[in-house]
Amino acid sequence: MSKIQNRVPYRLPKPLYCDPEEIGERPSMEQVKEYIRLHETRLRRYEYLESLYEGFHDIFRQPDKADWKPDWRLAVNFPRYITDTFAGYGYGTPVKISHPDEAVSNAVEQFERNNEFSDVTMELVRYCSMYGHAWSYLYQDEQAQTNVTALTPKEFFCVYDDTMKKRAVFAVRYSRHEVGDYKGELYGEIITPKLVQFFDRGRIIPEREQANEYGRINAVEWQLNSIRMGLYEPVAGLIELFNHTLSEKGNDVDAFAEAILAVIGAEVEEKDLENMRDKRLVNLFGTENVKDALVQYLTKPSADGTQENLLNRLERLIYQIAMVANISDDSFGSAVSGVALAYKLWSTSNVVQTFNRKIEKSLRKMFKLWCSFGTNCSRADAYEDMDFQFSVNIPRNLQEETDTAVKADGLISKRTQLSLLSYVPDPDAEMEQIEKERQEDEARQAQSLYGGDVQAAVAILEAAGYTVSRKEVIEDGEEDTAEE
């Protein structure tokens, strides 16, 4: 019997609260230890979900069967497939962050490059899919550059006040020594809005205390959903039962191959046994009442049909309840149009849209921290005007998109028309490029019409509303001559 059937249900990770008056400006080590103790009660859940993703399922922890019995341990890694498919579909295309102020937009782009932010985002998405939530942690390096990294909820937690606003009072990043004389002892850091304190072996180290440059807790929680439930957590029991059934099916196949041959009503000598094994033939004769002799294999009743039905139903339920499409299913091959494919991915898209709202909220909080440093951004409130654009990573029917955009000509604005095309990443930049090319074409046409009369060409273009210089018209003419 699988351990999942005997497991006491655990609680989902709710926020930790405190009375801010009891904590004061900084928590004591005793208070921190108490919250670490509460946090460690959640580690069992985190470790179980992590082991599912890594492929170490309960089937491998079942008691061994007798040596003479087949004992296959087969595990299908649905959790990893579900997680990686969801992450690739929803966030394989990096989140695009933009701002109306070009200087701010350039600074954000530099921050993303320095931190390989698309990879950090993907790690946070993966952690949220596994554990239900995760943390983005900001810090300043030796060059006073802002860095960001992804933390799992196994190593970091935050404690909030018990007011309606639920402000963060302090956070703890901790671990335990794994080797040496201090094996098992706690070490880490305590973060408050004003201070960062370090501790080791159960005591705070005063000489390492430093001011918190951010003025607030420099970490932001990312949530897959409001209850912090992992993506494959609702189907963990189904997955364990699927593994158990598949393993028993493998055992049945082995048992069938090793079935015992029973000879009833006749005596078989040793030399005859060898002959039967080598020639795979049974021929009994010269025995009294030979007609009553019976030769047959001893096998247990086959439940192959029942097992197959159960496996098929479990597989359908796993994808259905996890709300992640099985893209390897044969039915996906018939989804030739974009609309048909979108319908098949409808449930997954709903989960992605819900998660997108949570991500946008977390990103805005994170960039609020980032904007608090004048070296990053000249405006502390620049995060309010940031725009976060999410795009699903899905095969596109470019001909279908182009036909739709062409048919929409005259019904919608040019910008909206261009936004219908997935291969146009920035409609505004594309419109600017189109306008620039149009002006260049008309400049060349004007010069050609006036036989090289630059002054006349400039006058015509200015009358048409274009701002061009004599030099630009001459350069365009020289390019045309060179091409000829």
Predicted regions and their residues:
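Conserved aromatic-histidine-acidic binding/catalytic patches
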Residues: P70, G92, K96, L124, ...
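Short secondary-structure junctions and interdomain/linker hinges
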Residues: L43, Y89, T93, N114-D119, ...
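Extended, helix-rich architectural segments
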Residues: M1-N147, E478-E484
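C-terminal helix-loop subdomains that flank or include functional centers
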Residues: E274, D278-N289, T306, R313-E484
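Extended, regular secondary-structure scaffolds
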Residues: M122-V125, S129-R228
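Short amphipathic alpha-helical segments
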Residues: P100-V104, E112-V120, C128, P234, ...
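A short, surface-exposed helix-loop junction/capping segment
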Residues: S105-V108, L294-Q296, L345
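Extended, charged amphipathic alpha-helical segments
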Residues: I205-A340
